[in-house]
Amino acid sequence: MPARHPEALVAGSEYATVVVENLSRAQIVQYAGVSGDCSPQHVDEVYATRVGGYPTVFAHGMLTMGAAGRLVTDLVGDGRIVTFGMRFLRQVWPGDTLTARARAEEPETDRGRQVVRLTLAVVNQHGEQVASGYTTALVDGLVG
């Protein structure tokens, strides 16, 4: 998705992009190393299956949130995010492809600055929602 300017967001419009394609175990392990979260359900197949009862290792929730953040920064640009929250609804597995979706709401004034709230959803290749969330971002105004 080409970078947009926040003032080009249209209230009520929905935006979507693939943010992770065919997530690999290596990407999960790399995220564990960078984040410092080396919990065994994310990096140890034996632990995940025998102790945790999962079919395999799975991605960190924050990896999913970070991927969703890619859509947000594509829409509003860097340095404009005021709040960002996400709820993780189901595991993200190796091999998953994730699409982030955002819906723009009407702009508001917050402490003298114009902000827009985006409602977020992340779905896998099966159409299952794996996360939901929101972000607010500074904007100069909305068209439409």
Where are these regions (language model features)?
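Hydrophobic beta-strand-centered segment that forms part of the acyl-chain substrate-binding groove
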Residues: 49-105
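HotDog/MaoC-like acyl-thioester-processing domains
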Residues: 1-15, 93-144
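Residue-level structural signal for beta-strand termini and adjacent loop
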Residues: 20, 69, 135-136
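Short, intrinsically disordered, mixed-charge
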Residues: 33-36, 73-78, 125
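Catalytic strand-loop segment that frames the active site of acyl-thioester-processing enzymes
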Residues: 1-57
